[in-house]
């Protein structure tokens, strides 16, 4: 933008020139706020009465002029996108740290979640800031044209990697439920990393045609000065291969996993009832010895502990599926509008309004980006280990505080002493009760003898039986 001030004989002082320029600025603001401003003549005003000021802008629809004209409108959207970027980067860094440092979280599913967090973090570092820059420049590409294809490639790569990770997690958990022995045998850390490498390889292969053809032909990635996929074949094939097909696999395997868990829980409950019935059935007489009673009680306890362990494992699986289900649901809800609108833009090119479709795509793509920032919040709300780890990392405490040996002894020894004293008291009470029972038995024996002496001879057998029973 050029500001050309022509001095006149009546405008010799710098103060007057500044005041005149300020008047012209107020004139511009008044016209802009009244809604009469136009992008074609916003910077071509000339005050002809005194020939004081001439504001001109070459190419009024160029990015700098367009950005300056709509600066007041774009501030809020830029602020919101900046918040999304910060949340995405910070939250996913916390997830990566938690899986790397917490031993409780080091399993196959959390390794996939860590790789997913890496993809989301790179999306926040490399893709979202450039997208925010295009918003400030009126959705025009402000960088060198060769970087446009690279930026679209990274966008498609990280978005495809996200859906592929979720699809792989769903498949892995379904295999673990259906064939647990085989899954445990092939579920080492190395095998998990090999699966993650396979996911990234597939994502790179799907998105690689974009830079290959985009760098050769700018028309495939540019449309009216905006950096976007302009080839209809890229849009259709990419939408189905990178989103809809993995989405279908993910949803089907997730619901099959839920169904299998419900079936296992039902079988476990019925099996637990059968074991309890078999254990409660006793072949021993009621007047058995105390050791035999203890043996019977130990048999009765075994199925309960077995059932509790099995039900606990099923409950843990159900909780994990619940958290993953929320992640899947949010990802689908946030990305589906963009991909559906993307396909509509190709199918109904003639009947649909391109301006409306373009505006919807600009909004829906940021809703999809928001899913990368939401995942750490889901882990925080529904997983205690993640929540405690995040709170410690925010306070710069990277290791869990363990109690010193002295505190452990202070906390455990009094409890043990209390339990031992209670045990001794119980033993004393039991011994007193035994002594009383013995005294009663002895008195009964004495009474029996006395009664036998005074009683007739025909009752002697009955008395002797009573004494022997005691």
From Swiss-Prot:
Compartments, record wording: Cell membrane; Cell projection, Dendrite; Cell projection, Axon; Cytoplasmic vesicle
Name used for this protein in its record: 5-hydroxytryptamine receptor 2A
GO CC terms, sorted: axon; caveola; cytoplasmic vesicle; dendrite; plasma membrane; presynapse
Similarity annotation: Belongs to the G-protein coupled receptor 1 family.
One Pfam short name: 7tm_1
GO molecular function, one term: neurotransmitter receptor activity
Spans within the Extracellular topological domain: 1-80, 138-146, 216-232, 348-355
């Amino acid at each position: 933008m050029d500001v050309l001030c022509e001095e006149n004989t009546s405008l010799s002082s710098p103060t007057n020139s500044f005041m005149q320029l300020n008047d012209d600025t107020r004139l511009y603001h008044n016209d802009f706020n009244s809604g009469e401003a136009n992008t074609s003549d916003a910077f071509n005003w000339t005050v002809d009465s005194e020939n004081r000021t001439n504001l001109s802008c070459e190419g009024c629809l160029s990015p700098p002029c367009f950005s300056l004209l709509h600066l007041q409108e774009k501030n809020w959207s830029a602020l919101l996108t900046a918040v999304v970027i910060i949340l995405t980067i910070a939250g996913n860094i916390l997830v990566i740290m938690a899986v790397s440092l917490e031993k409780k979280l080091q399993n196959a599913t959390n390794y996939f979640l860590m790789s997913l967090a890496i993809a989301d973090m790179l999306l926040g570092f490399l893709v979202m800031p450039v997208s925010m820059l295009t918003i400030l420049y009126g959705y025009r590409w402000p960088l060198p044209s060769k970087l446009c294809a690279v930026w679209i490639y990274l966008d498609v790569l990280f978005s495809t990697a996200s859906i592929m990770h979720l699809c792989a997690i769903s498949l892995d958990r379904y295999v673990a439920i259906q064939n647990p022995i085989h899954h445990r045998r092939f579920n080492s850390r190395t095998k998990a990393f090999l699966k993650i490498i396979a996911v990234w390889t597939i994502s790179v292969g799907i998105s690689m045609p974009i830079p290959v053809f985009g760098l050769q032909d700018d028309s495939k990635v540019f449309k009216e000065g905006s950096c976007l996929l302009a080839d209809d074949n890229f849009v259709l094939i990419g939408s189905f291969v990178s989103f809809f097909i993995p989405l279908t696999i993910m949803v089907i395997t997730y619901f099959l996993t839920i169904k299998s868990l419900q079936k296992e829980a039902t079988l476990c409950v019925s099996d637990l009832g059968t074991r309890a019935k078999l254990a409660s059935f006793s072949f021993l007489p009621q007047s058995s010895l105390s050791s035999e009673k203890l043996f019977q009680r130990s048999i009765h306890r075994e199925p309960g502990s077995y059932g509790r362990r099995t039900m606990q494992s099923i409950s843990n699986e159900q909780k994990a599926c619940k958290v993953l289900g929320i992640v899947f649901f949010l990802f689908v809800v946030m990305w589906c509008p963009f991909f559906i609108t993307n396909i509509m833009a190709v199918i109904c090119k003639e009947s649909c309004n391109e301006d409306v479709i373009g505006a919807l795509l600009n909004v829906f793509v940021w809703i999809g980006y928001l899913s990368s920032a939401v995942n750490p919040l889901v882990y925080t709300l529904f997983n205690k280990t993640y929540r405690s780890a995040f709170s410690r990392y925010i306070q710069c405490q990277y290791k869990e505080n363990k109690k010193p040996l002295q505190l452990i002894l202070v906390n455990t020894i009094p409890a043990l002493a209390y339990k031992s004293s209670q045990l001794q008291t119980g033993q004393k009470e039991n011994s007193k009760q035994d002594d009383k029972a013995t005294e009663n038995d002895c008195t009964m024996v004495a009474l029996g003898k006395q009664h036998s002496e005074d009683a007739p001879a025909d009752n002697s057998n009955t008395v002797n039986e009573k004494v022997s029973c005691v």
